[in-house]
UniProtKB/Swiss-Prot annotation:
Reactions this protein catalyses: choline(out) + n H(+)(in) = choline(in) + n H(+)(out); thiamine diphosphate(out) = thiamine diphosphate(in)
Topology, Extracellular side: 54-227, 272-307, 378-452, 520-557, 616-635
A single MF term (Gene Ontology): antiporter activity
Tissue specificity: Expressed in colon and cecum.
Keyword Cell inner membrane included in the entry's annotation: no
Gene name, Swiss-Prot/TrEMBL: Slc44a4
Protein's recorded name: Choline transporter-like protein 4
GO biological process, one term: thiamine pyrophosphate transmembrane transport
Organism lineage string: Eukaryota, Metazoa, Chordata, Craniata, Vertebrata
Native source organism of the sequence: Mus musculus
């Protein structure tokens, strides 16, 4: 007895009875004010970064292609010309990179022009046509020349100056650019030395992009055909999730028992199977001494020692689980009772089930703001132009300052006939451009901090609502009228700083994990096993640290929602309270995880099976208006429905999990604060009182507990 008391004292003193305590404290003050001020200053800086990015950035260089002069195709004067045509795409196709072109502009040493449509048929200028005019030779194809070319210009002169293309290839638009189509037979003049094989080899790096475009079109068509059925599947997932949670008050005990028996049965079958395999290989005399060491791990399945080791491991797990059932059965009953009470709490406050929608909207705002800011920062800078000549060996072009900067508005006073001032890219010499890396790092920190703050806000708000349910002595009479909105306003008003403190700690650990993942990716080709081992150990340690901080933050937010203390005090009190009841914590955590995993499996699996049978045509539609959609890839709406069902189930069950954790901490506080007397009655439900062998004294003289 003395030893147990010393252990409890090592984990802090039990909560003392407070006659004024009636649930989440209403008269509270602001907590972690310094962190709140720092967070608000950081958000202000984040907004300034966004404004700087908006002023200097130009995302059009990613969204729209550009011609040789740097003008955008598809906007402004080129609104009706959304595609860019390369005069000689084979001169750059070998080193082309679609994403690089989208981000950096001109990458090919060939003129580019905005066009309304891509060429549909092969065509080329014959040698005998060089002396004719552009209007005579090109005709309607003159729109593929640069706008400045005159129809009376001689063709040979226009080709020397790079004003018109010598040939056209059948092309398809992809990412706003005209790319030649592969595997199409055509013939061009022999002096060009261009044929179907040359084009196919030259644009081999672009074929995947073209194919990807075709696939993307088919995917879009499938979504257009099946979007309403996907919404139906998501509605089924929502209904199943809500129904599962509400029915837990009725089926929690048999369901948990069924799951535990199922785990025991699976382990028992594993032991039986391992024993059978062990006997087979023992009779054959297959031993590891005969096999020796090998890197072919599948070979170890053919030796008796492998199956014996697996048998021992499964037998140990089976024994541990049986011992837990025997010695921790009362704690399992407590966990089941808390699950039932959580289901009851959710039923009394149905609005809490839809709070994840608020979290989702806030997360979309945070992630969207970061993405737009990062895009604008990445595209900041002033356009730069350089001199370029298609053939520097032409008479008069020997001393041309190629690659030197120029002004596109200034006249070209040069003897070189094909000299041009073309767009090169965007400068990196401005203030915003020199600080680009630092601003992007600031944005990444802002992303992690704001996202974690939004998640912390949701946890604290839900904890405040569910705590008001537990500490209502007469349910539902004593439950506040608007518990969720009251908790939301209370959290924002008093505890923004505390949430920011916890979110910052978690964000720093997550950023460290991202940096380690990047280093590990860079060292993946390294042959240094020591460095790889060290990185792996650091990753493992940071993963464990992140899990612990998430667990600590979650319980700290519950204590903040109830008592209104600062983050450090709340985290300490929550940790000490849990350490004084560590066995109950472990049992409740595992039982809840098992139950919620089964719930997710039920929802996602049910929606997945129904989607598969419907979209694959195995279930016919209900009448003419509800026919099965004709799809290119029937697995696409199936996977979309499954992922959507998982997101919905995770959102609903995260609320339920927060409810269980909140009620559990309140239950532990209730045990320490109260003793069941008239002055200090227990707030827990009768089922928990019965399991613990406790009861509240009946009020005498018709007295009832004051609110």
């Amino acid at each position: 007895m003395g030893r147990k008391q010393n252990e409890n004292e090592a984990h802090g003193n039990s909560a003392k009875y407070d006659p004024s305590f009636r649930g989440p404290i209403k008269n509270r003050g602001c907590t972690d004010i310094i962190c709140c001020v720092l967070f608000l200053i950081f958000i202000l800086g984040y907004i300034i970064v966004g404004l700087v990015a908006w002023v200097y950035g130009d995302p059009r260089q990613v969204l729209y292609p550009r011609n040789s002069t740097g003008a955008y195709c598809g906007v402004g004067d080129n609104k009706d010309k959304p595609y860019v045509l390369y005069f000689d795409i084979l001169s750059c196709a070998a080193a082309i990179n679609i994403i690089s072109i989208a981000e950096n502009g001109l990458q090919c040493p060939t003129p580019q022009v905005c066009v309304s449509s891509c060429p549909l048929a092969p065509w080329a200028v014959e040698v005998f046509q060089f002396s004719k005019t552009v209007g005579e030779v090109y005709g309607e194809r003159r729109n593929f020349c640069l706008p400045a070319v005159s129809p009376d210009m001689i063709v040979e002169e226009s080709l020397q100056k790079g004003l018109c293309p010598r040939f056209l290839l059948p092309s398809t638009p992809a990412l706003g650019r005209c790319f030649p189509l592969p595997n199409i037979n055509f013939t061009l003049p022999e002096d060009l030395r261009i044929n179907n094989t040359t084009v196919s080899n030259g644009i081999s790096g672009l074929l995947d992009s073209i194919n990807a475009r075709d696939v993307s079109v088919k995917i879009f068509e499938d979504f257009a055909q099946s979007w309403y059925w996907i919404l139906v599947a998501l509605g089924v997932a929502l209904a199943l999730s809500l129904l599962f949670i509400l029915l837990l008050r009725l089926v929690a005990a048999p369901l948990v028992l069924l799951l535990i028996v199922g785990v025991l049965a699976v382990l028992a079958y594993g032991i039986y199977h391992c024993w059978q395999q062990y006997q087979v290989f023992r009779d054959k005399g297959a031993s590891i001494t005969q096999l020796g060491f090998t890197t072919n791990f599948s070979a170890y399945q053919s030796v008796k020692e492998t199956w014996l080791a697996a048998l021992i491991v499964l037998a140990v797990l089976e024994g541990i689980l049986l011992l837990m059932l025997i010695f921790l059965r009362q704690r399992i009953r407590i966990a089941i009772a808390l699950l039932k009470e959580a289901s009851r709490a959710v039923g009394q406050m149905m609005s809490t089930m839809f709070y994840p929608l608020v979290t989702f909207v806030l997360l979309v705002i945070c992630i969207g703001y970061w993405a737009v800011t990062a895009l604008y920062l990445a595209t900041s800078g002033q356009p730069q132009y350089i001199y370029w000549a298609s053939n520097t060996s032409t008479p008069g072009c020997e001393n041309v300052p190629v690659n030197m900067t120029c002004d596109p508005m200034a006249p070209l006073n040069s003897s070189c006939p094909n000299l041009k001032c073309v767009f090169k890219g965007y400068s990196t010499t401005g203030l915003a451009q020199r600080s680009l890396f630092n601003l992007q790092i600031y944005g990444v920190l802002g992303l992690f901090w704001t996202v974690n703050w939004v998640l912390a806000l949701g946890q604290c708000v839900l904890a405040g609502a569910f705590a008001s349910f537990y500490w209502a002595f007469h349910k539902p009479r004593d439950i506040p009228t608007f518990p969720l909105s009251s908790a939301f306003i209370r959290t924002l008003r008093y505890h923004t700083g505390s949430l920011a403190f916890g979110a910052l700690i978690l964000s720093l650990v997550q950023i460290a994990r991202v940096i380690l993942e990047y280093i590990d990716h860079k060292l993946r080709g390294s042959q240094n096993p020591v460095a790889r081992c060290i990185i792996c150990c650091f990753k493992c340690c940071l993963w464990c640290l992140e899990k612990f901080i998430k667990f600590l933050n979650r319980n700290a937010y519950i204590m903040i929602a109830i008592y209104g203390k600062n983050f450090c005090v709340s985290a300490k009190n929550a940790f000490m309270l849990l350490m004084r009841n560590v066995l109950r914590v472990v049992v409740l955590d595992k039982v809840t995880d098992l139950l919620l995993f089964f719930g997710k499996l039920l929802v996602v699996g049910g929606v997945g099976v129904l989607s598969f049978f419907f979209f694959s045509g195995r279930i016919k539609g209900l009448g003419k208006d509800f026919e099965n959609p004709n799809l290119n890839y029937y697995w696409l709406p199936i996977m979309t429905s499954i992922m959507g069902a998982y997101v919905i189930a995770s959102g609903f069950f995260s609320v339920f999990g927060m409810c269980v954790d909140t009620l559990f901490l309140c239950f532990l506080e209730d045990l320490e604060r109260n003793d069941g007397s008239q002055e200090r009655p227990y707030y827990m439900p009768k089922a928990l009182l019965k399991i613990l062998g406790k009861k509240n004294e009946a009020p005498t003289g018709g007295k009832t507990r004051k609110k």
